[in-house]
């Protein structure tokens, strides 16, 4: 193998398979491996182009006759929480987010397993074992963090480590933002809206770190599972002309955003 072939990413196309989001459609993905010294730079570049990371693979939809999957990123510094979002923040004011290295724990897996069993028992991740979970967390050649959300343990003082674990986010740190790779929570906490809370917390974290964006993955028009991503405004959506600004739940602005 030549030096050029080692340094140049190789892209592959998957065979068609049933789309998990839009009934009656087939999906295909183009993917490459994120390995070596240039993995971080490549992940940045590909994320800007609409790719997502899963372990050491970066992928994006490449469906034959469908372009429904649209990459979305929230403009962190301009985001202002709505009344409903402020209520979510208030309901979770007893939680503290602790950023850690991407190291899996049995405590995390217990929450992860309960989350899959209650929320996604028929999904593609339903059969993941503890070893599969460990691979999901550890198999990364880019800057990845775990954020654990725990009940605030006031009995041990204001600076004490949090108490019971209720939610977890696996997050990549990019040059221009935070990319939420996967998040999960205790499904018994039905009144907290923990998925929403973790996104709001990531927006606040990005703002504090001076990072302009929070990448949420794909918004898919017509998929109820993905409708929630359109509520975090202003945001940008990736189109053929580039990243287009969206001010309200509707069409994007006509001019691409840098």
UniProtKB/Swiss-Prot annotation:
GO terms for biological process: ubiquitin-dependent protein catabolic process via the N-end rule pathway. Its main location: cytoplasm. It catalyses: N-terminal L-glutamyl-[protein] + L-leucyl-tRNA(Leu) = N-terminal L-leucyl-L-glutamyl-[protein] + tRNA(Leu) + H(+); N-terminal L-aspartyl-[protein] + L-leucyl-tRNA(Leu) = N-terminal L-leucyl-L-aspartyl-[protein] + tRNA(Leu) + H(+). One of its GO terms (molecular function) is leucyl-tRNA--protein transferase activity. It comes from the Bacteria. Keywords: Acyltransferase, Cytoplasm, Transferase. GO terms for cellular component: cytoplasm. Pfam families: ATE_C, ATE_N. It is found in: Cytoplasm. Its EC number is 2.3.2.29. InterPro entries: Acyl_CoA_acyltransferase, Asp_Glu_LeuTrfase, N-end_Aminoacyl_Trfase, N-end_Aminoacyl_Trfase_C, N-end_Aminoacyl_Trfase_N. Belongs to the R-transferase family. Bpt subfamily. Functions in the N-end rule pathway of protein degradation where it conjugates Leu from its aminoacyl-tRNA to the N-termini of proteins containing an N-terminal aspartate or glutamate. This is Aspartate/glutamate leucyltransferase.
